[in-house]
């Protein structure tokens, strides 16, 4: 983390690249393979109540003005979760609404107050978790858990940059994603990146090739095969040897289905004609 937060987070690879350039070991090698892997986070995913309580406690601890705000949903100086009949939907809904109102009261009270970086980050995180999982309730001034998941949801106030990602429909992971660009013949890693787990492979892969000369052949799986990524590679002067996205049929609908290969594509007219 110290290296990542320094003014030269890529210093190790800068040194490696300097050696590569000096030796000329990659001279004439015009292929790069792109890939990524998920890195599990050590922190547990938090529910909405846990996030709200944790974020409010932190702001009250860091900002004296926040500690002076009157809050009623929970004793934030006490350890543990709020007292609640968790199997009672109405009681849980009332608690969530109260916590959100406490958070909003604190945020409103701090408007215009000068904050340092640590305090500002804590208040910003509180504002985020106070809104990402909820929506206005039926009565004025009330809130309820929204029946949707925020696209870039923070999963833990302990590690706000960690994200949730579905590896498949039934397999999911929480954490980060490591991306690499590799020269396949020598195995030398030419570029790396670390992103939240929900970051797309394709756009990050394009960034990994930003310092390369034109004319590479890019090897990758179908995660890098979107139209915008292929277009970006072409604009950068590279050719793509990327596995096509597999054809899939809905197993619940039987065999009378079309795939993309069944459509007639006219690139000049920019039309796609359905075979049906």
Map each language-model feature to its residues.
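Polybasic low-complexity intrinsically disordered regions
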Residues: 1-222, 227-235, 245
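Helix-centered, glycine/charged polyanion-binding patches within enzymatic domains
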Residues: 229-276
């Amino acid at each position: 983390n110290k290296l990542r937060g320094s003014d030269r987070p890529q210093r190790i690879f800068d040194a490696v690249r300097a050696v590569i350039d000096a030796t000329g070991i990659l001279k004439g090698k015009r292929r790069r393979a792109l890939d990524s892997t998920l890195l599990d986070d050590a922190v547990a995913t938090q529910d909405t109540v846990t996030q709200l309580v944790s974020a409010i406690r932190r702001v009250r601890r860091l900002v004296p003005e926040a500690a002076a705000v009157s809050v009623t949903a929970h004793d934030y100086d006490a350890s543990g979760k709020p007292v609640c009949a968790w199997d009672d939907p109405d009681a849980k809904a009332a608690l969530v609404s109260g916590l959100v109102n406490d958070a909003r009261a604190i945020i409103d009270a701090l408007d215009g107050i000068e904050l340092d970086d640590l305090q500002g980050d804590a208040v910003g995180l509180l504002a985020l978790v106070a809104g990402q999982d909820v929506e206005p309730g039926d009565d004025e001034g009330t809130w309820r858990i929204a029946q949707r998941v925020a696209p870039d949801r923070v999963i833990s106030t302990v590690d706000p940059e960690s994200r949730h990602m579905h590896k498949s429909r039934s397999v999911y992971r929480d954490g980060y994603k490591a991306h690499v660009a590799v020269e396949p013949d020598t195995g030398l890693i030419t570029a790396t990146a670390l992103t939240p787990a929900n970051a797309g492979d394709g756009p990050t892969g394009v960034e990994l090739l930003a310092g390369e000369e034109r004319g590479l052949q890019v090897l990758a799986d179908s995660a890098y095969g979107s139209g915008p990524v292929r277009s970006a590679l072409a604009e950068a002067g590279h050719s793509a040897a990327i596995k096509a996205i597999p054809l899939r049929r809905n197993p619940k609908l039987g065999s009378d289905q079309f795939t993309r290969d069944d459509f007639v594509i006219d690139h000049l007219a920019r039309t796609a004609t359905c075979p049906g």
